[in-house]
From Swiss-Prot:
GO molecular function annotations of the record: DNA binding; DNA-directed RNA polymerase activity; ribonucleoside binding
Database matches in Pfam families: RNA_pol_Rpb2_1, RNA_pol_Rpb2_2, RNA_pol_Rpb2_3, RNA_pol_Rpb2_45, RNA_pol_Rpb2_6, RNA_pol_Rpb2_7
Family, as annotated: Belongs to the RNA polymerase beta chain family.
Function: DNA-dependent RNA polymerase catalyzes the transcription of DNA into RNA using the four ribonucleoside triphosphates as substrates.
EC number(s) from the headed UniProt entry: 2.7.7.6
Annotated protein name in UniProt: DNA-directed RNA polymerase subunit beta
One GO biological process term: DNA-templated transcription
Source domain of life: Bacteria
Lineage of the organism: Bacteria, Pseudomonadati, Pseudomonadota, Gammaproteobacteria, Enterobacterales
GO CC terms, sorted: DNA-directed RNA polymerase complex
InterPro entries tied to this protein: DNA-dir_RNA_pol_bsu_ext_1_sf, DNA-dir_RNA_pol_bsu_external_1, DNA-dir_RNA_pol_su2, DNA-dir_RNAP_su2_dom, DNA-dir_RNAP_su2_hyb_sf, RNA_pol_bsu_bac, RNA_pol_bsu_CS, RNA_pol_bsu_protrusion
Subunit comment: The RNAP catalytic core consists of 2 alpha, 1 beta, 1 beta' and 1 omega subunit. When a sigma factor is associated with the core the holoenzyme is formed, which can initiate transcription.
Cited PANTHER family: DNA-DIRECTED RNA POLYMERASE I SUBUNIT 2
The entry's keywords: DNA-directed RNA polymerase, Nucleotidyltransferase, Transcription, Transferase
Amino acid sequence: MVYSYTEKKRIRKDFGKRPQVLDIPYLLSIQLDSFQKFIEQDPEGQYGLEAAFRSVFPIQSYSGNSELQYVSYRLGEPVFDVKECQIRGVTYSAPLRVKLRLVIYEREAPEGTVKDIKEQEVYMGEIPLMTENGTFVINGTERVIVSQLHRSPGVFFDSDKGKTHSSGKVLYNARIIPYRGSWLDFEFDPKDNLFVRIDRRRKLPATIILRALNFTTAQILDLFFEKVVFEIRDNKLQMELVPERLRGETASFDIEANGKVYVEKARRITARHIRQLEKDGIDRIEVPVEYIAGKVVAKDYIDENTGELICAANMELSLDLLAKLSQAGHKQIETLFTNDLDHSAYISETLRVDPTSDRLSALVEIYRMMRPGEPPTREAAENLFENLFFSEDRYDLSAVGRMKFNRSLLRDEIEGSGILSKEDITEVMKKLIDIRNGKGEVDDIDHLGNRRIRSVGEMAENQFRVGLVRVERAVKERLSLGDLDTLMPQDMINAKPISAAVKEFFGSSQLSQFMDQNNPLSEITHKRRISALGPGGLTRERAGFEVRDVHPTHYGRVCPIETPEGPNIGLINSLSVYAQTNEYGFLETPYRRVRDGVVTDEINYLSAIEEGNFVIAQANSNLDEDGRFIEDLVTCRSKGESSLFSRDQVDYMDVSTQQVVSVGASLIPFLEHDDANRALMGANMQRQAVPTLRADKPLVGTGMERAVAVDSGVTSVAKRGGTVQYVDASRIVIKVNEDEMYPGEAGIDIYNLTKYTRSNQNTCINQMPCVNLGEPIERGDVLADGPSTDLGELALGQNMRVAFMPWNGYNFEDSILVSERVVQEDRFTTIHIQELACVSRDTKLGPEEITADIPNVGEAALSKLDESGIVYIGAEVTGGDILVGKVTPKGETQLTPEEKLLRAIFGEKASDVKDSSLRVPNGVSGTVIDVQVFTRDGVEKDKRALEIEEMQLKQAKKDLTEELQILEAGLFARIHAVLVSGGIEADKLSKLPRDRWLELGLTDEDKQNQLEQLAEQYDEMKSEFEKKMDAKRRKITQGDDLAPGVLKIVKVYLAVKRQIQPGDKMAGRHGNKGVISKINPIEDMPYDENGTPVDIVLNPLGVPSRMNIGQILETHLGMAAKGIGEKINAMLKKQEEVAKLREFIQKAYDLGDSVCQKVDLSTFTDDEVLRLAENLKKGMPIATPVFDGATEKEIKELLQLGGLPTSGQITLFDGRTGEQFERQVTVGYMYMLKLNHLVDDKMHARSTGSYSLVTQQPLGGKAQFGGQRFGEMEVWALEAYGAAYTLQEMLTVKSDDVNGRTKMYKNIVDGDHRMEPGMPESFNVLLKEIRSLGINIELEEE
């Protein structure tokens, strides 16, 4: 493998045995591709904005004299960039402009004669844009639109599995689900009649819908039944015979023909009898007359002489009727063929319970069901039915729905109309009847071929269409009002409803979620999440076990491990690593093609529907060099079952062992040795890890770390290769390689880094360069590390030296004992940034004022404020300190004469304002790192705001000037090269000022042209700089667009440094979580023979019952990795020759059976080897991919190479006594995470605070400064102890005895420590409730 210069800095040793056939795809593509599809111009009009416009336009007036046509649309440029939107609290969006054409037709002239055409571009609101990391900035906060897994449109056949009816009879049903429009359900009832429901309303006999489609009874019977024809000849009854139909019947008379008896009376007819009849070609037999009684007539029979109806279709025949028919001259009688086996008379029975007789009565019946209480008219009934399933405006199956519908009915073509046809409805009924008759299977609703993904683009398009439809009605009315000659398209379109619909979706839809931004992994997982909840999806309460369960089709599409614990389990899933959606929105996963037992490198993506037809081998099947299966029998999956197949039967093979799991689960090393429940917790807790001060790469990883760090977008990645020309904490400048430049550009890439910004979860986002001056860079290299990344690898926690042993009960019940050294070295110190805002409003009594002049506040409290009343940057503040001084006018109160006198003498006016300053919340302390002031347009800016503005302008100017200088330097270097090659001496040039170079003339025409081109570029660059500077200046100095009534907003950012402390929650990656019980002095920690103390002591009892053995293997492998690091460190300290170092490191990389990774250090220069060694001395990072990890043998070999015992256990000594522990202890390195459940955020104690209004009891919860509830069971406990006075105190003065608790104050102040309990307020509430029931209850005073 070829490594770039940056990748050579630290190479992770890989234990994977299977070669990586397919690279890990870009992990955010599900979001980005979907949104791209939504906003890009699609000439076909299949999807996106284009599809929405085409489905609503053209809009015609009611009279048809005019129409508004859609031509095209374009998206403008966003006003602010992403960062500015976040600071200002606005939405990152682009204006949508649509070109519309108003066509007016002549009234009197023939149809289609155009009178006038007007075309105009109309503004249609703002469309939020996706940032390059797949998020949206809505009102200044980053949000993610989660993809939804919903039932695919189409037709589904299902049964109630015998749960509905008490008899346990299985009732079958069919449901046609459109993409938009009314649902159509067919269902059997326990009496085997077929019913229909529209939109889950009252059921009607299913034949009503056929009558509404204009079928007569005879036509209906013709559709669903085969016929038996009886013929009356010479007073004898003959029946047409199809021998196959006799299967399973018992003969009720002798079946004979041509004098030969084939079946005797009362004998069962067998297959032999049928063969005999077929062989002899018997096609009619004589039957006794009684046989026809009870048969059902297939059509109407009329007496042609009198014109009267003898018997109607679907009537049962009797001998009387037969005689009448015979008299009327009907010699042939068609009856329905039914039997009990597989041709039951469901439709015939249903017709008998159907009250309607013709189309109109059927339509009226449907109208009554849909609109109860409204008088039906013929027209209304016809319109309603027409609009239900046959109008393109109201009903759409969509391409997916039509494809699923046709596949379900086994049709060949998969395309067709989006509305239903007669055939569609009758074929669904036929298939349902076949299933009831035992032919065919019901569908599996949880099969991923029946559930599809709706991503951002599709949901946004649907919302946009909803907005357009709202506008459509208004436009129609406007077109019908007349005076069209003066109208322009923009007079008709109101952009409000459209932008409101879009805004509502992005701002408050259930699937538009506040982004989880704890660390890069939580961002990526949130964007790859798939939810079955949300509009048009399931609800938590109604979802049963089946929906939540893992289904065989999840394999390689949805992760079986990563899902939340609790009520949402199984409803919220995560996309597997390689999964993607196809054009229809079904999930598909890649497989390698197998031909004749040879695995090729051809890769096909299969959806769950296609996968069912193939035999698929697992990724860990053993192959020889030519890609043949070594074993004759291979474990494969086929039709959702796993079994053994011979190697020639195999069609496909899995691409990778990680294919099954999601990104989160694929980061857990030795996942294959963990119990699934614990793996689930492990995958979920990695997302809660807080980025530490200094990220530390995991010693034991899985090889996925780099992909996650790069794809998450928190790192800065090189767009093009080149050399590092300049680097500091806030920017990196790359001089681009010649071959990657565009013609005629300066060839400089500038990367500005994010410094100390707040994330959604209040953690700190900060980027640090990880390249040095002059280093060569390749495209895709990581230039700067973000939060939780280390040299471009995900680093969520820290490698800790752990020992598994009990220690004085401090690790009882999963508690964790931590060494003081961890605190001293700041291993788990995290920075949290809080944003506090102070809003100054315009009130009825006058504007609130931000000022340092606050009434009744001492000098000390104002010491950290400047003259504008805003805190200084860098001030260290604690709970209760004033950050922004603000006063609010209060209403004039009636003054006493004395006060009036004092006022008159001293002119004091201070009492008409009250202090409403922004203070630091209790329990928070930190450093002010930034202040932002936003002032409304037209309000005068205060001194601080002007200072900030000045500073921003300076910074912007500095940035742009530096950028210009860098670009100029690059350009002049090229000018210099042209001039020198054109024959001008270099030392003469160096004496000339640079600006004069461009005035020089060259004899060589080519060179002169080049020079002129460069000169043009230079001018362009300068004018570009001026433009940029102007735009920046405008943005910084303009007033801000604030909410109505708001004059000013001051935002203060506090950075809080949190060290690890008892009560914080920590976890490993295997679901092994615990709370810190004690920070132990270093000297008391157990230590080894070299005197190295351990950092963390974990309880060994937490392992066996939880079955997450992965943590033990990780510990051993971590120890080995550290051991090798120690050896490298020793060699570096001794300053051994590079050759020795190279040999040892090479040995470490070559160890094990890995085929994929071949690190050849002989191609590295000495400097590169030394730099690699420098990065490996703290431990050699190791990758052990999921399901393909290091074996026990390999771990032992690595331990041996590191000079450590292969048992993984060492002798420890007690730090307090120095005695040796009785037996050896497992010690090693485990990757530990600090989770975002910090004791500082949870610890809370109430003094005296606010009370609930009705009950007068203290509120609950930290946010309300509430108390601890002393509930019913706690009362029982005090009762049980007989602690009467304590109980009385709890229920009265400490809770809701209003007078008692105020008296208590007075008593304490007076030094009298008695209490006088009164009546609790809740008792009065009880009295009031009883009175409200009409029972008067009064208390008698004694």
